A protein has these predicted regions:
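Membrane-interface alpha-helices at helix entry/exit sites of multi-pass transporters
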Residues: 125-135, 165-168, 275-286, 333, ...
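Membrane-interface loop-to-helix entry segments
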Residues: 168-229, 260, 283-287
């Protein structure tokens, strides 16, 4: 041992404790190496998202206003009930393939940021190019202003208030402002509210599906009801099917849009308890739940509403369903408020996650 080393040892106190692992971790300065992204991080406020909150964060992002509007357009394009249902299953399969990639990256890189982290890790040069693209997309294209407008429109329609452009935008701005304040100042309260809205949304879709099954099994038989049930037989399922590739691809795009949001949890993994284990179970459970509910609601639509009316309904198939089951007055009130709740829940979870993506981009520099 050299004399300088001996002098350094002599200056150390005899009763000093050895440095702990925590002290060692705090003494390590963060580097700009991309390999550091494989290390898990914990958010400043801790890991506040339980399994249930994580599940709602995903399923509430997936189930939006699409299930109330797109089934009619898909049946009109495909021509038959069976082919339409097949496309809903096919959309779930395609989303599952995409989900596998998200699970692989999420378990390997359990940090908030989602695609920003994954693209930075995969495409390292030019530096910050991938993260800048993700930031631009998140800021300019990723927000959910359209759902805010939908919320304002359907609240006014459901409450039977004469709509105007000012009142619609005022409600939209009020919703967005309230959600921003809640998520910014009251983290746990915001999570609780979006959990409640998410469960209300799931319960509403389940209620619609079970209502359709109840009508099929216990409602008084009429000629219109018999015609609706006939199209659910094996021969009726595939009648007038349109197998054109152009038609199927367009309809499949519409179906795939209804499954958007499967990787929503990947954006907030810093705040999830047991992130890897939670991600492995929440993502597949959300995919199976969405596929099951979509099929159930579609069957309810086809069992209650005549096929010709379904094809001509455009984006109003849910309105026809509620009108057939509950009557015009009740359906006209319940349906718009249901869509408004769906839109509000979607805005809450999108706001919650997009803020994390933006902050991940800012604090990575």
């Amino acid at each position: 041992m050299s004399l300088p080393d001996q002098a350094d040892d002599a200056q150390q106190p005899l009763l000093s404790s050895p440095p702990s692992e925590d002290d060692a971790g705090r003494s390590v300065k963060p580097t700009r190496n991309v390999e550091d992204t494989v290390l898990p991080e914990t958010a400043t406020l801790g890991r506040t998202l339980s399994w249930t909150s994580a599940y709602i964060l995903v399923i509430s992002r997936i189930i939006g206003s699409g299930i109330f509007a797109t089934p009619g357009a898909i049946v009109k394009a495909t021509g038959s009930v069976g082919l339409a249902l097949l496309l809903w299953v096919g959309g779930a399969f395609i989303s599952g393939c995409s989900l596998i990639v998200g699970l692989e990256y999420g378990c390997m890189l359990p940090r908030s940021g989602g695609e920003k982290v994954y693209l930075e890790f995969t495409y390292r040069y030019p530096r910050f190019f991938a993260s800048t693209l993700v930031a631009v997309q998140a800021v300019l294209l990723g927000f959910t202003a359209s759902n805010c407008i939908v919320f304002g429109e359907y609240v006014l329609f459901g409450l039977r208030i004469e709509p105007s452009e000012f009142t619609q935008k005022a409600l939209a701005l009020g919703l967005l402002t309230a959600i921003t304040i809640v998520h910014g100042c009251f983290l746990k309260t915001g999570i609780w509210i979006q959990n409640v809205l998410g469960w209300v949304k799931v319960g509403l879709v389940m209620f619609m599906g079970l209502t359709g099954l109840y009508v099929v099994l216990f409602h008084v038989r009429t000629a219109e009801h018999a015609a609706a049930l006939e199209k659910l037989s094996w021969d009726g399922l595939w009648k007038d099917s349109n197998w054109g590739w152009g038609t199927l691809s367009t309809a499949l795009f519409k179906v795939s849009y209804s499954y958007t949001g499967m990787q929503n949890l990947n954006n907030v993994l810093n705040e999830v308890k047991n992130p890897v284990r939670t991600l492995k179970t929440v993502a597949p459970a959300s995919l199976l739940t969405a596929c099951f509910l979509y099929l159930l609601v579609n069957i309810a639509y086809f069992a209650v509403v005549p096929l010709d009316e379904v094809k001509e309904s455009g984006q109003l198939i849910a309105a026809l369903f509620f009108e057939k089951v509950f009557g015009w007055n009740f359906g006209r009130t319940v349906l718009p408020l249901a869509i408004a709740i769906s839109a509000a829940g979607n805005v809450m979870v999108v706001t919650f996650t997009l803020v994390r993506i933006t902050s991940a981009r800012i604090f990575s520099d």
